[in-house]
From Swiss-Prot:
The keyword Membrane applies. Residues 1-123 are mitochondrial matrix. GO terms for cellular component: mitochondrial inner membrane; mitochondrion. It is a single-pass membrane protein. It comes from Schizosaccharomyces pombe (strain 972 / ATCC 24843). The chain crosses the membrane at residues 124-144. Residues 145-249 are mitochondrial intermembrane. This is Cytochrome c oxidase assembly factor 1. Required for efficient assembly of cytochrome c oxidase in the mitochondrial inner membrane. Involved in a step coupling MSS51-dependent cotranslational insertion of COX1 to the addition of its heme A and copper B cofactors. InterPro entries: Coa1, Coa1_fungi. GO terms for biological process: mitochondrial cytochrome c oxidase assembly. It is found in: Mitochondrion inner membrane. Belongs to the COA1 family.
Length: 249
């Protein structure tokens, strides 16, 4: 069987030119049927081309279905002009074949409308669950971003980086362990309570910093309860710097 890549379609141009001129439509079909008329023309066309073109029209039709639809419609139009056949069931079949081959790509590429998505009762719970999941993920990331960039976390991290005890335990270049650190705990400055911890790493080891502070009295005075660094089972206390650094506003 000859592949479609090696098939030269220009070899059939004289055949279609002959069809247009009417040289191949010399014998009328014995029955007034569009399908038999097309078959008669196909047979006569094969006889007309068998000496000059080794590939018959029937094998060419099997190679390319899309081109077959267009050629059959062309035969149908020529038969109607030559013999005056009426459009019957075969004509409707050829028309459907031609429309299916031409309009398939447009139907596949069409995006569904918003009403079609929302009208399906099965898709509504899935879309609602996906929306809730996306909203929850964005909310958690936003809260963690706020904790990471809060003045409490930045001041405590500054104290750890400049602490002599922390440098002896972790080494130099102390920073957050991950590019986007996870800061669990409570950071409620308005309610007067802070209890957070985050992971840090240096050139020698890594550890966990825990900070806890609470506000007492009507003057809104913050009291630091805990500020420690734990690494490899060893816990050290981070010294307090300037007193105003522990008064959170």
């Amino acid at each position: 069987m000859i592949s479609s890549k090696s098939l030269d379609y220009t070899r059939f141009l004289p055949f279609f030119a002959a069809l247009v001129r009417g040289h191949c439509l010399t014998v009328k079909s014995p029955t007034h049927n569009c399908g038999s008329g097309v078959k008669t023309i196909m047979d006569k066309s094969s006889i007309f081309l068998k000496n000059r073109y080794p590939i018959s029209i029937n094998r060419f039709v099997q190679q390319r279905k899309t081109f077959c639809g267009a050629s059959v419609c062309l035969h149908k139009v020529l038969v109607q002009r030559q013999f005056g056949f009426e459009e019957k069931s075969h004509g409707l079949k050829y028309k459907k074949l031609f429309r299916r081959n031409i309009g398939t790509s447009e139907k596949k590429n069409r995006l569904p409308d918003l009403l079609e998505l929302s009208s399906s009762p099965r898709r509504l719970p899935i879309l609602f669950a996906a929306f809730c999941l996306l909203w929850g993920t964005c909310a958690v990331l936003a809260i963690q971003y706020g904790k990471q960039n809060s003045n409490v976390t930045q001041v405590v991290m500054y104290r750890v980086q400049h602490s002599k005890e922390a440098q002896d335990l972790l080494g130099s270049n102390i920073d957050f362990k991950y590019p986007f650190p996870w800061v669990p705990g409570k950071l409620h400055k308005r309610q007067g309570f802070i209890d957070i911890n985050f992971e840090v790493s240096g050139s020698l080891a890594s550890g966990t910093v825990h900070y806890q502070s609470q506000r007492f009295g009507p003057i809104a005075h913050w009291v630091e309860l805990d500020c420690t660094l734990t690494s490899n089972g060893k816990t050290i206390k981070i010294p307090t710097g300037v007193s105003k650094d522990t008064q959170w506003t």
